[in-house]
């Protein structure tokens, strides 16, 4: 207990109430409908639809980053059009990362086994690292940067720190600072900003409007990533059509599409 509260019952009650409130916010998987400006009847996006949108926009983003950026003159014959297409592809692709973070938070909140949830994300992070290295350097090992799945896994560890250390704020804070430092040092995709975004979405999961505001504030790019954050408001809380083992196809899509793009980039265009 805080030493200052031992001789002050009023302060002790306030400290206890603050801890109880924080604990209820962290442990509850429910969303307060009053904190979503979109009426429930208009919330038409299921988790499966959000996954589909995330995958499609990510694919568009990576086509722009890895094919158009390096092979513009081949893909687009007219001079000057490659940069225009590159900009369009990357702008559309900015929608994907906020959705991946949001889905990660929703998965953490509703999973029945948080250890297995994290283990699966770690496994896909390791697999994805191979294709990430190939697409960036045409080598199996490239320590200079890490894939977005590493960022998401660090976000998972951050959510675990908040959930399991919620009664020990100093230890929780140290754990989060350490994870922020790791995300910066190993140069994860989206870096420390991406890690902080995921943690913020978790802390604000009961209020969709606050998630939207925090997301736009973090990425400071309403015209690009803002569309992804708007999708939060239309989420209906339902799983949708992707069920059972098919959910792993969503995660396998990331390394699989990078592998295909690597083959096109290096084997077709050279």
Residue ranges of predicted features:
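Alpha-helical transmembrane segments and their immediate juxtamembrane cytosolic regions
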Residues: 1-270
């Amino acid at each position: 207990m805080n030493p200052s509260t031992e001789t002050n019952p009023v302060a002790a009650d306030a400290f206890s109430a603050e801890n109880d409130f924080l604990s209820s916010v962290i442990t509850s998987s429910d969303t307060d409908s009053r904190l979503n400006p979109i009426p429930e009847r208009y919330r038409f996006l299921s988790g499966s639809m959000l996954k589909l949108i995330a995958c499609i926009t990510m694919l568009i983003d990576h086509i722009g980053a890895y094919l158009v950026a390096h092979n513009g003159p081949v893909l687009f014959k007219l001079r000057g059009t490659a940069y225009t297409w590159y900009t369009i592809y990357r702008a559309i692709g900015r929608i994907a990362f906020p959705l991946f973070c949001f889905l990660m938070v929703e998965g953490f909140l509703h999973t029945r086994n948080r250890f297995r949830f994290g283990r699966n994300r770690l496994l896909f992070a390791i697999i994805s690292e191979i294709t990430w290295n190939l697409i960036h350097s045409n080598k199996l090992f490239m320590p200079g940067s890490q894939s977005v799945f590493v960022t998401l896994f660090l976000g998972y560890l951050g959510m675990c720190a908040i959930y399991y250390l919620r009664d020990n704020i100093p230890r929780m804070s140290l754990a989060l600072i350490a994870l922020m430092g790791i995300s910066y040092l190993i140069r994860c995709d989206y870096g420390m900003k991406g890690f902080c975004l995921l943690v913020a979405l978790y802390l604000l999961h009961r209020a969709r409007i606050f998630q939207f505001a925090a997301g736009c504030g973090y990425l400071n790019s309403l015209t690009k990533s803002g569309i992804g954050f708007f999708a939060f408001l239309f989420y209906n809380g339902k799983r949708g059509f992707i069920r059972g083992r098919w959910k792993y196809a969503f995660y396998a899509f990331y390394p699989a599409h990078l592998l295909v793009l690597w083959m096109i980039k290096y084997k077709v265009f050279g």
